[in-house]
Amino acid sequence: MKGLRAFVPLLLSFGIAVSVSAQDASSTTAPTTAATTTASTATTSAGAAQGSSGEEESDAELAKKLNNPVSDLVSVPFQFNWENGINSPDRTRFILNIQPVMPFKLNEDWNLIARIVAPILSQPPRFVDGIGTSGVGDPLVSFFFSPAMGKIIWGVGPAISLPSTNDPTLGSQKWAAGPTFVALRQASGWTVGALVNQIWSFAGPPDRPSVNQMFLQPFVAYTTANLWTYTINSETTANWEDDSPNRWNTPVNFMASKLATFGTFPASYLFGWGYFFASPDDAFGATWKVRGAVTILLPKKKK
């Protein structure tokens, strides 16, 4: 039953996405990056506001780029996740994801965006009377080649999982790689899109299970004139090597974030809650989670 429910949030997210895209089909927008893209104009009325120096990107431009996984904005998010109900209502797993985004301009037409997700985990034991584990998980490094302009923002490239953990319960201990793709549209304050990757293991200890895993993240976000952003997304993982009851992990997240500048230091602050419509039936499946995040921004100077 959990496996079947994995499709519910995906259909919901894509249904909202199609509806919003249809409403905005008559307007135009330029791309941004990061998992979003960059634009020459702001998407909300807040675009008229400029930075204090007049040389930095405006707050509205920064807020727009934060919604774009492939924008030209250098950022360092620190994402804190508390996942509850790990095989028992009172068991919690903590995950800190450090997710730097580094864009590179290849030429006037193309950008290269490097995104890293480096997890640090602390989780309860598989069995209630065991000992928990803490440490570094396997980082995922993604590279997106993205056109600098276009109404539809997109990027494509390779994703590589690095076997950096020394604890078998915190990672696969396998080298894995595959394609990744992101596409989105931004207009009138809305950002609608999806990010997907599929990786397969190709090296590592032979006694460890093979990796054959898909990640799918549809997202819908709306940014207001006062720079509040409200987002709903799904972060679905499908482990194709596992049996059906343990294959799907499908949290749906509801989040609010605010861009704020203290002096000349811009940052985004986020809080959210998520519910797992599907999760593995084994000892590490969660029921719900709380998320907090701080994203440090390094805006580029205007020429």
Predicted regions and their residues:
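Bacterial N-terminal signal peptides
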Residues: F7-A17
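Sec/Tat signal peptide C-region and signal peptidase I cleavage site
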Residues: V18-A22
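Transmembrane beta-barrel domains of Gram-negative outer membranes and organellar outer membranes
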Residues: D24-K303
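N-terminal secretory signal peptides that target proteins for export/translocation
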Residues: M1-R5
